[in-house]
C-alpha cells in the first residue's frame, strides 16, 4: 500500500463514515491503524478513541494521532469539534475502536453523532467485532465497510445494510481476508489485510499495562 491518503484503491481519506468489522485477530484494527498512519503522514488531524490499547501485528496507533481512552474524553472532544464548526479545507478523521462502547443500542445519547458530525467535516472510522451490537442508525451512516471474518448472522446484517445478499455474506473469509463494500453499489473488492500491509499476523502482541 502506498503512503498516499488520496489513494483511490484504499479510500483512506474518503469524506464519508467507514466501518471496519471482524472477529478478534482477523486484521480489522491492523487495517484501521495503517489507514490512520497514512492520514497522519498526509498531515490530516486524526483522533482515536481506544479504551484498550492492544498492539496489533502492525503496531500501535501512529505518533501524531491524539489518543482518547474514556467515553468522557470522547464526548468532550466531539463537543469541541462540533462547536468549532469545521473547516472544509481541514477535515478531521476520528477512529473509534470498540465502537459498540460508544454507538451501542443503549447509547442513545450518541446516535446523533454519526448522522450530524460530518456537517462539521468530521468523519468517523468505526471499528467493531460485532456489527449487530452497533445501533442500525449508526451502521447505516457508513458509506464503506471493510468486512473481515464474521459470524454468519453478523455478515448477513452488514451485507443487508449495504445492499448485498447471500452472494457476499456466504463468502468464506480466512484470517486477514477482507471484503470492501460500498453503499449503493454492487461492486466489491477483496484483499488480504496482512498481505496488503506486509506484516506477520502471528507476531506477538502486547497489551498496555
Which residues does each PLM region occupy?
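Conserved C-terminal "switch" segment of AAA+ ATPases
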Residues: 166-175
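A structural signal for isolated positions on well-ordered beta-strands in alpha/beta enzyme cores
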Residues: 47, 123-125, 179
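Walker A/P-loop NTP-binding active-site region of P-loop NTPases
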Residues: 25-67
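Flexible, charged surface loops at secondary-structure boundaries
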Residues: 11-14, 40-43, 60-62, 81-90, ...
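Short secondary-structure boundary/capping segments
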Residues: 10, 136, 170-171
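Conserved P-loop NTPase motor module
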Residues: 1-22, 31, 40, 44, ...
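Conserved P-loop NTPase motor cores
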Residues: 18-36, 68-166
Amino acid at each position: 500500500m502506498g503512503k498516499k491518503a488520496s489513494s483511490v484503491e484504499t479510500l483512506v481519506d474518503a469524506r464519508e463514515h467507514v466501518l471496519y468489522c471482524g472477529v478478534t485477530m482477523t486484521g480489522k484494527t491492523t487495517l484501521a491503524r495503517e489507514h490512520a498512519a497514512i492520514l497522519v503522514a498526509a498531515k490530516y488531524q486524526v483522533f482515536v478513541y481506544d479504551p484498550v490499547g492492544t498492539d496489533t501485528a502492525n503496531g500501535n496507533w501512529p505518533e501524531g494521532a491524539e489518543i482518547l481512552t474514556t467515553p468522557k474524553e470522547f464526548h468532550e472532544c466531539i463537543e469541541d469539534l462540533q462547536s468549532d464548526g469545521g473547516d472544509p479545507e481541514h477535515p478531521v478523521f476520528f477512529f473509534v475502536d470498540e465502537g459498540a462502547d460508544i454507538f451501542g443500542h443503549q447509547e442513545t445519547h450518541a446516535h446523533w453523532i454519526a448522522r450530524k458530525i460530518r456537517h462539521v467535516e468530521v468523519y468517523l472510522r468505526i471499528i467493531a467485532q460485532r456489527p449487530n451490537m452497533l445501533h442500525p442508525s449508526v451502521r447505516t451512516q457508513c458509506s464503506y465497510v471493510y468486512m473481515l471474518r464474521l459470524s454468519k448472522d453478523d455478515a448477513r446484517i452488514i451485507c443487508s445494510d449495504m445492499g448485498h445478499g447471500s452472494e457476499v455474506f456466504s463468502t468464506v473469509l480466512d484470517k486477514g481476508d477482507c471484503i470492501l463494500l460500498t453503499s449503493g453499489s454492487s461492486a466489491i473488492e477483496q484483499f488480504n489485510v496482512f498481505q496488503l500491509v506486509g506484516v506477520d499476523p502471528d507476531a506477538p502482541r502486547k497489551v498496555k499495562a
